[in-house]
Amino acid sequence: MARVAYYGTGRRKQSIARVRLVPGEGNIKINNRDIEEYFKYETLKRDVRMPLTITDTLSRFDVIATVAGGGYTGQAGALRHGISRALTKSDEELRGTLKRAGFLTRDARMKERKKYGLKAARRSPQFSKR
């Protein structure tokens, strides 16, 4: 018998997360490591679990995810986005709850590029009067 799985892809900053939801007890594996081992900060762990918590599906699904690129914050955001998309595929009625929470919207904010003549994206060189 084939196992039921729901897939979702999430993106945030430079990070891309491929998420697979399978029926289970609520275990979250990221790049073959447990969530407690992968993320150091409790805020990031809470951020990843938020779509499951808000829809009361934390104990119904196991999350198996592959994340690449970016830093920890971007990866946590990408996971949240991917989990939300996979949850809508599992049950279309959850879409309204996730949409109201803003989890289905791709956060389009990216790092601003450095411009020539400046030290950073907006920081100008130090002004010298003489």
From Swiss-Prot:
Keyword Cell wall biogenesis/degradation assigned: no
A GO term from the CC aspect: cytosolic small ribosomal subunit
Keywords recorded for this protein, A-Z: Ribonucleoprotein, Ribosomal protein
GO biological processes: translation
GO terms of molecular function: RNA binding; structural constituent of ribosome
Pfam families given in the database record: Ribosomal_S9 (PF00380)
Organism superkingdom: Bacteria
InterPro entries per UniProt: Ribosomal_Su5_D2-typ_SF, Ribosomal_uS9, Ribosomal_uS9_bac/plastid, Ribosomal_uS9_CS, Ribsml_uS5_D2-typ_fold_subgr
Similarity field: Belongs to the universal ribosomal protein uS9 family.
HAMAP family the record matches: Ribosomal_uS9_B
Name the UniProt record assigns to this protein: Small ribosomal subunit protein uS9
Organism: Alkaliphilus oremlandii (strain OhILAs) (Clostridium oremlandii (strain OhILAs))
Designated gene of the protein: rpsI
